[in-house]
């Protein structure tokens, strides 16, 4: 019979040790034995709480931006998948919360940003929340590292080449390789995007498709035949001082 005092002591020791390890080390630790796996599998444990509180900006934890990710571990994961301050237009900066980009009011420029982590395998979903005016063009979707992040004029930059795929929320058009691929979603009088709505982007690297959801309603497959390349969450914007947030959710739930 296991001594409950000894078990509690062991738990507390592991908690302290794991709190001081780097996240990559925690991933390795979870593969050591079943006991450690179950310990770290608790996504609201004090270990994940400690890492979350020490790595995430306090501003993001106090807001409702992360309301779709309920555990400390998923909040932490979302932070490491957020917009990259090193992979965006020079006219864009990432706000202190770590999840929201701000486009500076630069005339005759279209500006884009990519997420920190791209995907080549598996199924992934993330939320995009446009928190400022859309302007004449506002596009959400995906791109490879080769896609441009800035250009002259007010254009649909995301979807303007063969390295990016986007949905223009202003006109409800799908864009790729500089061409309009059709209307989306395929509904009569499809409602336009309202500022503040959460759109879920669903990338399936196994079926090579990109889809979207709005208000928990699946809008259908937008793009098929995506290439076997690493693809990154991306948006492009034209309106000065507009802001766009992105929260990675993980594997999409079916049904």
Curated annotation (Swiss-Prot):
Component of an E3 ubiquitin ligase complex composed of hiw and Fsn. It comes from the Eukaryota. Required in the presynaptic motoneuron to down-regulate the levels of wnd and restrain synaptic terminal growth at the neuromuscular junction (NMJ). Keywords: Neurogenesis, Synapse, Ubl conjugation pathway. Residues 61-253 form the B30.2/SPRY domain. InterPro entries: B30.2/SPRY, B30.2/SPRY_sf, ConA-like_dom_sf, F-box-like_dom_sf, F-box_dom, FBXO45-Fsn/SPSB_families, SPRY_dom, SPRY_FBXO45. SUPFAM superfamilies: Concanavalin A-like lectins/glucanases, F-box domain. The keyword NADP does not apply. Pathway: Protein modification; protein ubiquitination. GO terms for cellular component: cell cortex; neuromuscular junction; nucleus; pole plasm; SCF ubiquitin ligase complex. Its main location: other. One of its GO terms (biological process) is negative regulation of gene expression. The gene is Fsn. It comes from Drosophila simulans. This is F-box/SPRY domain-containing protein 1.
């Amino acid at each position: 019979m296991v001594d409950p005092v000894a078990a509690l002591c062991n738990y507390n020791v592991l908690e302290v040790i794991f709190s001081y390890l780097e996240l990559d080390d925690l991933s390795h630790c979870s593969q050591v034995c079943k006991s450690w796996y179950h310990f770290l599998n608790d996504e609201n444990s004090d270990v994940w709480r400690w890492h979350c509180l020490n790595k995430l900006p306090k501003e993001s934890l106090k807001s409702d931006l992360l309301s779709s990710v309920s555990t400390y571990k998923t909040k932490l994961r979302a932070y490491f998948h957020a917009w990259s301050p090193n992979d965006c237009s020079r006219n864009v900066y990432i706000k202190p919360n770590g999840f929201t980009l701000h486009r500076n009011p630069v005339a005759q420029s279209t500006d884009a940003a990519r997420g920190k982590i791209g995907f080549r395998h598996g199924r992934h979903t993330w939320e995009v929340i446009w928190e400022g005016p859309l302007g004449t063009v506002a596009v959400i979707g995906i791109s490879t590292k080769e896609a441009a992040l800035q250009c002259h004029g007010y254009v649909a930059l995301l979807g303007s080449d063969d390295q990016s795929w986007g949905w223009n929320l202003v006109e409800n058009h799908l864009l790729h390789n500089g061409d309009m691929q059709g209307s989306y979603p395929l509904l009569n009088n499809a409602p336009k995007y309202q500022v503040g709505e959460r759109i879920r982007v669903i990338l399936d690297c196994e079926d090579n498709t990109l889809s979207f959801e709005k208000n928990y309603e699946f809008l259908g497959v937008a793009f098929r035949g995506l290439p076997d390349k690493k693809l990154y969450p991306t948006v492009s914007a034209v309106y000065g001082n507009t802001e766009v947030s992105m929260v990675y959710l993980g594997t999409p739930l079916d049904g």
